[in-house]
Curated annotation (Swiss-Prot):
Function: Represses a number of genes involved in the response to DNA damage (SOS response), including recA and lexA. In the presence of single-stranded DNA, RecA interacts with LexA causing an autocatalytic cleavage which disrupts the DNA-binding part of LexA, leading to derepression of the SOS regulon and eventually DNA repair.
Gene coding for it: lexA
Xref: SUPFAM superfamilies: LexA/Signal peptidase (SSF51306), Winged helix' DNA-binding domain (SSF46785)
Its EC number(s): 3.4.21.88
Gene3D superfamilies: Umud Fragment, subunit A, Winged helix-like DNA-binding domain superfamily/Winged helix DNA-binding domain
Protein species of origin: Polaromonas naphthalenivorans (strain CJ2)
Family: Belongs to the peptidase S24 family.
Leader sequence segment: none
Catalytic activity: Hydrolysis of Ala-|-Gly bond in repressor LexA
GO biological process terms on file: DNA repair; DNA replication; negative regulation of DNA-templated transcription; proteolysis; SOS response
CDD domains for the chain: S24_LexA-like
DNA-binding interval(s): 41-61
NCBIfam families attached to this UniProt entry: lexA
Name this polypeptide is given: LexA repressor
Length: 234
């Protein structure tokens, strides 16, 4: 079992968490940072030694009640870290190793809307606006935000209108959430390479896998490193 830091002593203006709640919050954060998706209730139960996923569900409900996560009904991975709780969690980690007055740089992230065929994803005409975030909000520093369109990734909590934080990359590991360009379309999917074929997998049974055929125009644009709910970014 991986070790966890104790984040129960959050600042006074933040919800106070029990040690177990802090462990679960850190587990969620680690899973999103490493795989691009939150854990299932069963995975939380297995990681922390609970007898059943129901115990994990009760802790998640308590965290949601305290306002540090949001639960999306009807999906096994429907857990979202609220932006302010992610910041508090990172501030707690940083404060263990550096003076409270030390602050990290602010990130300037362009928001990419619709992408025209054949042009770079960060071309000026694609940028709708610019957002500013503390760099400590992200485990890996993103290069841009992409507005999610559609519900193909619904079951891991990525919804239409959300802003996906993306780090530019040309390679991906199986299971990572990627931004890919296939022909004239840019899409967010789970990456899987099977021998010589690449599959782009949805997280919604209503959407079939996309199989990239040999010779078909395909380009990996980046890896998902964070998610911001669209309503929080208004």
């Amino acid at each position: 079992m991986r070790t966890f830091n104790d984040f129960s002593g959050l600042p006074a203006d933040r919800p106070k968490l029990t040690a177990r709640q802090a462990q679960i919050l850190e587990l969620i954060r680690n899973a999103i940072a490493q795989t691009g998706a939150p854990p299932t209730r069963a995975e939380i139960a297995a990681e922390l030694g609970f007898r059943s996923p129901n115990a994990a569900e009760e802790h998640l409900k308590a965290l949601a009640k305290k306002g540090v996560i949001e639960l999306v009904s009807g999906t096994s991975r429907g857990i979202r870290l609220r932006t302010d709780s992610l910041q508090a969690l990172n501030e707690s980690r940083i404060s263990q190793f550096s003076p409270p007055v030390q602050r990290l740089e602010q990130l300037t992230l362009p928001l990419v809307g619709r992408v025209a065929a054949g042009s770079p994803i960060l071309a000026q005409e694609h940028i709708e606006r610019t957002y500013f975030f503390e760099s400590r909000l992200f485990e890996q520093q993103p290069d841009y935000l992409l507005k999610v369109r559609g519900m193909s990734m619904r079951d891991i909590g990525i919804m239409d209108g959300d802003l996906l934080a993306v780090k530019q990359a040309r390679e991906a590991k199986n299971g990572q959430i990627v931004v890919a360009r296939l022909g004239d379309e840019v899409t967010v999917k789970r990456f899987h390479r099977n021998q010589h074929l690449i599959e782009l997998l949805s997280e919604n049974p209503d959407f079939k896998p996309i199989v990239v055929q040999p010779g078909e125009p395909f380009e990996l644009e980046g890896l998902a490193v964070g998610l911001i709910r669209g309503s929080l970014a208004m």
